[in-house]
């Protein structure tokens, strides 16, 4: 069953009418095909027009949709032969950040990403995708393995931000994020990062400092959440829609600013409407980018990353 967002109410009402009409016609000889087709056409057009005109705040809500595909969905349907690797060899294993060896379109890769979970139990287990220091140190370990074995790195970013708890700070959260970012920039192998949902602050940048950065059409990427920004600037989270607009959080804005390289289209109505199609589309896009990067030597890949981020800073 689809979980509707607030701005999708008109679509929800139409789809409910369609469902009621189908149920009422079951077992009857009444021909409702014409009316059903009319309503379905109207619903599809309304859904398309709604998603063509989403505001940055509405896109933020779509990026956070609970049914949106997560790391495990991409691993299951876009990658093959996944072998998970756990632990940072220092403190423990963080289930908010997962990774391991896999194959993408026949190519061996190391894949790393945030996992938010899809129900109450799994969300708690994965800490809602908020990585801890041991998670980022695990990512560093996997990136070092990728460099040692000459395997491309793929990262799937979906986090509201790194975990801000006291225990994480005590274990060196800031240092772990900085070291993970440094590891990305120093990789001697191709790296493609994809923002698949939320890309929140340093917790996202630590896995997205790649030479090619992709974003799903309705994903968001920002230095702080709209609510957090609004609370600082206006002392109220109710100004979150204004903050989202001002921060340029959408894939479309970030592509125009040169922060990301490619927007990956989503099914009409968002990735949560057709997760399998969304996953397949992104998998194809990542494989294409890896093909392009395969011709570069290690020193050229590092130079590409340096130029990318120096250009943004300048």
Predicted ranges, named:
Residues 60-63, 124-128, 269-272:
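Short hinge/gating elements
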Residues 157-287:
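Conserved catalytic cores of soluble enzyme domains
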Residues 1-108, 276-314:
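Intrinsically disordered, low-complexity segments enriched in small/flexible residues
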Residues 32-35, 135-136, 229:
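Short, motif-level signal for alpha-helix interfacial/capping segments enriched in acidic residues
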Residues 14, 55, 111, 158, ...:
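Terminal peptide-recognition signature
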Residues 61, 101-103, 108-112, 154-156, ...:
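Structured core elements
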Residues 91-93, 99, 104-156, 163, ...:
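Glycine-rich beta-alpha loop segments
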């Amino acid at each position: 069953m689809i979980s509707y967002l607030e701005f999708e109410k008109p679509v929800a009402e139409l789809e409910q009418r369609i469902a009621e009409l189908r149920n009422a016609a079951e077992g009857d000889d009444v021909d409702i095909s014409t009316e059903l087709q009319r309503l379905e056409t109207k619903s599809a057009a309304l859904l398309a027009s709604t998603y063509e005109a989403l505001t940055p705040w509405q896109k933020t809500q779509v990026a956070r949709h609970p049914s949106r595909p997560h790391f495990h969905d991409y691993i299951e349907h876009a990658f093959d032969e996944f072998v998970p690797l756990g632990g940072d060899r220092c403190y423990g294993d963080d289930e908010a950040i997962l990774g391991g060896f896999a194959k993408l379109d026949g190519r061996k890769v190391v894949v790393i990403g945030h996992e938010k979970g899809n129900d109450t139990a799994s969300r708690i287990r994965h800490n809602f995708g908020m990585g801890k220091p041991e998670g980022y140190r695990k990512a560093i370990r996997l990136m070092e393995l990728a460099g040692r074995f000459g395997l491309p790195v793929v990262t799937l970013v979906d986090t509201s931000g790194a975990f801000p708890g006291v225990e994480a700070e005590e274990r060196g959260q800031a240092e772990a994020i900085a070291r993970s970012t440094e590891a990305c920039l120093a990789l001697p192998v191709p790296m493609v990062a994809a923002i698949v949902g939320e890309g929140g602050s340093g917790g996202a940048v630590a896995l997205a400092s790649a030479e090619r950065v992709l974003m799903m059409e309705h994903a968001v990427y920002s230095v702080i959440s709209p609510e957090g920004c609004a609370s600082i600037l206006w002392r109220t989270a109710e100004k979150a829609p204004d903050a989202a607009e001002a921060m340029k959080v959408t894939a479309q804005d970030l592509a125009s600013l040169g922060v990301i390289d490619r927007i990956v289209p989503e099914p009409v109505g968002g990735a949560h409407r057709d997760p399998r199609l969304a996953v397949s589309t992104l998998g194809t896009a990542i494989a294409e980018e890896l093909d392009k990067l395969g011709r570069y030597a290690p020193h050229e890949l590092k130079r590409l990353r340096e130029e990318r981020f120096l250009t943004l800073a300048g």
